[in-house]
Amino acid sequence: MQQLEHVRFPEEAGISSQGILNYIAAREAAGLEHHAIWVMRHGKVAAKLNYAPYDDHTPHMLFSLSKSFCSAAAGFVVQEGLLSWDSKVIDVLPEAAPEQPSEWLSSVTLHHLLCMGSGLKVESDGIRSGTDWARRALACDCDHAPGTHFHYNSTGTYLVSCMVQKVTGMTVRDYLIPRLFVPLGMMAEGGAAPEWDCSPDGVNMGGWGLYLSCEQIAPFGQCLLQKGMWDGKQVLPREWIDRATTAQIDNGNGEHPHDHDWNMGYGYQFWMCKTDHEPGQTPRYRGDGALSQFVIVDEKRDMVVCCVSGVPDIGKALGLMYEHLFAAADMPPADESVQAVLQQKLTELSYPWPTHDGSDLPVGVYVAEEENVMMTIDSNQVGLPMPNGEIAQFTPGCVARVGNTMSCCGMQDGALHLLLRMPSKPFTVDVAICFDDEGDATLILSGIGPDPRTIHMKKIA
């Protein structure tokens, strides 16, 4: 089986060590929290950036990067003759169709769903609870003729998942096991298939919900670069790749500059990227997900970059990668001293945990009645409820792992700092706590919701 070759120094793959160092410095200066990054060129892994406590082998929530894998399933279904790009949604899913579908809804095809040109109304993309998701989405009807307007719609990708499951009798995940995950060596440790969340109707989400590690994403990106070839065989359908990775619809809406990364065209669940290539040259494209989950393919440079992250500003994350990681392929080789600096730096990549000055914790029970939140502090542990209802425990000066969470706390100058990380998810809960003269507490919570929250808590015991 074809394996990705791991080289000792980036220069062996045509990448400058100095370019990688430039990226590491730029990322740190920008405060972007990437978890794991692989940089590949000429089929070789030039550099792996793992920021502890994260790594490149733990499956990670991909958000909308899942869409690119659902698209691949559609490619296989078409190749096997079970559907065509022109298959109409209501013909494949008649049980979900309205009794009298409109002309526009009746003409929505697999192609339209894949290129985000279905014309389905915006409200169709808000279905995340209850059952009968497909029926409820199609009941929303269309507000544009299919193929005439780009509208990013994750429920549209869910409908693709429904179509694949209807004609194969298998979920998208199970369908991809022998066709993609096994041939590319993407199965998890012990041979387990990747996890992909399902709707209450038993259908893989399609547009989100897949968990893969950076190590698992990498061969998918390399196979795309190789036009579907892997180990001398055509694994991914070539026709699908040609469609998926070239613009199928104009996604410019006038809100961004003409060369903006979200204005360059959209394929089949892939975005066309900004590029420094001349017009008409080989493209750069990407699959991406919220908080900067990426697989980016640059055909001109014969290069793939994939990453899992917790970075809300996708544009800034992409910009630094273009400026430094892809540019590293255009730089002269670094000398041995720079290579040595990079190798040392790669062993030191990490995010800090709270430090503890050894002072006593402010023991007590604290409540915020308006928030219905209670915090307990004893001599060696802090308990604070999380949004999922579970009580997170924090130990001063000690990183503890329970299930999929890692936590630590520390006192510094009378203030308490709590930090919780989730190695398989892009979420970090950061809590700064100050105590007043009466012993009451003020919490500033970051990572729960888009903006920091301030909570005042009264000490009751």
Predicted regions and their residues:
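Active-site helix/loop module of the DD-peptidase/beta-lactamase fold
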Residues: 61, 80-118, 139, 167-207
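Active-site SXXK
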Residues: 43, 61-86, 113, 160-164, ...
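Peripheral terminal and inter-domain segments
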Residues: 334-461
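Active-site Gly/Thr loop motif
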Residues: 188, 193, 245-304
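A short, well-structured edge-of-sheet supersecondary motif
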Residues: 19-54, 302-306
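Structured C-terminal helix/loop/strand segments within mature extracytoplasmic catalytic/sensor domains
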Residues: 287-353
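Active-site-proximal alpha-helical segments within enzyme catalytic domains
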Residues: 156-163, 208-229, 241, 293-310
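Short active-site loop at a secondary-structure junction
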Residues: 28-38, 51-95, 102-108, 144-152
